[in-house]
């Protein structure tokens, strides 16, 4: 059994809090504490840090359900981070931009042929990523990564598209590596 150090535990707790807020937000600290099973002090410390870093937002007060103060509602800041998604089929390339709440901000569809080469596809992906990022004025440091859906079979350990039956120019293509080098983002 592997030991977990304090930093790993803190990182785990922060991810747990963020993922819970993404799923259930807006949410009060009390409900958040109940859902994640951490102490009130830990939840307060984590959420205060995330508010200070502008990763979370305060979204008003909860409706009064009993006596006492209304609870402050927390949600993730949709513009704190962004992700990119790429879907490649034999007929279409789609590149999308999503915010931190998982909402699609925008996407671009490009009609392609199954004879497209990997180099042509990577060029198209880069052009459309750049267009979306510039159009929505997303700072590079807010881009956390790229998810890719492509015809298989795919070797998940090496990132190679091995022998897709409908893309004749795509035998043993290291798509993950090509995109990481070109986009300078995790894929």
Language model feature labels by segment:
Residues 1-35:
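Extreme N-terminal segment that seeds HTH/winged-HTH DNA-binding domains in transcriptional regulators
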Residues 21, 32, 43, 47-56:
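Basic amphipathic alpha-helical segments that dock to polyanions
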Residues 28, 57-58, 155:
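Short beta-strand(s) of the beta-wing in winged-helix/HTH DNA-binding folds
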Residues 38-49, 66-68:
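Canonical helix-turn-helix DNA-binding module
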Residues 51-67:
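Beta-hairpin "wing" of winged helix-turn-helix
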Residues 70-107:
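Gly/Thr-rich phosphate-binding beta-strand-loop-beta motif of the actin/hexokinase/Hsp70
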Residues 108-187:
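Glycine-rich phosphate-binding loop and adjoining helix at the ATP-binding site
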């Amino acid at each position: 059994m592997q030991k977990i150090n304090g930093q790993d535990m803190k990182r785990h707790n922060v991810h747990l809090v963020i993922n819970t807020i993404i799923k259930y937000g807006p949410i009060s600290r009390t409900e958040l504490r109940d859902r994640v099973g951490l102490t009130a002090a830990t939840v307060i410390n984590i959420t205060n840090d995330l508010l200070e870093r502008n990763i979370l937002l305060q979204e008003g007060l909860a409706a009064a359900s009993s006596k006492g103060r209304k609870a402050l509602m927390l949600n993730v800041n949709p513009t704190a981070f962004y992700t990119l998604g790429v879907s490649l089929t034999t007929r279409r390339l789609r590149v999308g931009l999503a915010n931190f709440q998982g909402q699609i901000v925008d996407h671009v569809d490009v009609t392609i042929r199954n004879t497209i080469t990997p180099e042509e596809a990577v060029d198209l992906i880069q052009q459309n990523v750049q267009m979306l990022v510039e159009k929505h004025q997303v700072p590079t440091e807010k881009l956390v990564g790229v998810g890719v859906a492509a015809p298989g079979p795919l070797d998940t350990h090496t990132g190679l598209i091995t022998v897709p039956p409908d893309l004749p120019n795509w035998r043993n293509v290291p798509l993950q590596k090509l995109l990481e080098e070109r986009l300078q983002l995790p894929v």
